[in-house]
Curated annotation (Swiss-Prot):
GO cellular component, one term: proton-transporting ATP synthase complex
A biological process term (GO) from this entry: proton motive force-driven ATP synthesis
Organism: Mycosarcoma maydis
Protein name: ATP synthase protein 8
Subcellular compartments: Mitochondrion inner membrane
Principal place of residence: mitochondrion
Keyword DNA-binding: no
Origin organism lineage: Eukaryota, Fungi, Dikarya, Basidiomycota, Ustilaginomycotina
Keywords: ATP synthesis, CF(0), Hydrogen ion transport, Ion transport, Membrane, Mitochondrion, Mitochondrion inner membrane, Transmembrane, Transmembrane helix, Transport
Length: 48
């Protein structure tokens, strides 16, 4: 039963943290600035 081996949990935790870090990096670098730019442009358009 591989679920009882300790390195199985270490492997799962390390890949979970790696995936979380990659997801956080991609969101903060590429996806979220586009939304910020969109909201800022909407705000400028409504203030005109």
């Amino acid at each position: 039963m591989p679920q009882l081996l300790p390195f199985y949990f270490v492997n799962q935790i390390s890949f979970a943290f790696l995936g979380l870090f990659v997801l956080l990096f991609v969101f903060s670098k590429y996806i979220l600035p586009a939304f910020v730019e969109l909201f800022v442009s909407r705000m400028y358009i409504t203030k005109l």
